[in-house]
């Protein structure tokens, strides 16, 4: 299996990560199908080419639907989940055991890094 190494001295958000994966050739439908294995309801993704500050890439917009079917783009006013919340969600998902293990390890590393700078 190929290994992807990130060098993000300024960090990377989840939507930036999804856009980068699509820009590298990951099929957006396959990506969304895997994410659908998580127990979250009423959302969809949009992937669009974008250029900012002379840097081109794929922008991922995450749209969460409310109970009336309306949607809004992901913004900074959202709820942040703790590592424990994420761990419970991943463990309770329909993802494969290997993906669960890898995802929890990645989020643990992220939690440790975030804890050291905040």
Please tell me what each predicted stretch does.
Residues 23-117:
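Glycine-rich nucleotide/cofactor/substrate-binding loop typically near the N-terminus or early
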Residues 12, 117-118:
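A short alpha-helix capping/helix-coil boundary motif
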Residues 6-18:
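Conserved phosphate/anionic-ligand binding catalytic regions in large, soluble enzymes, centered on
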Residues 1-4:
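Extreme N-terminal starter segment of soluble prokaryotic enzymes
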């Amino acid at each position: 299996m190929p290994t992807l190494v990130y060098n993000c001295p300024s960090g990377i958000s989840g939507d930036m990560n999804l856009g980068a994966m699509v820009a590298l050739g990951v099929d957006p439908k396959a990506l969304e199908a895997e994410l659908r294995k998580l127990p979250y309801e009423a959302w969809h993704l949009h992937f669009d080419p974008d250029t900012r500050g002379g840097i081109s890439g794929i922008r991922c917009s995450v749209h969460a639907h409310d109970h009336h079917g309306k949607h809004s783009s992901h913004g900074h006013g959202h709820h942040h989940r703790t590592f424990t919340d994420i761990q419970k969600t991943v463990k309770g998902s329909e993802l494969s055991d290997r993906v669960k293990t890898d995802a929890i390890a990645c989020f643990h590393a992220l939690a440790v890094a975030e804890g050291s700078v905040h």
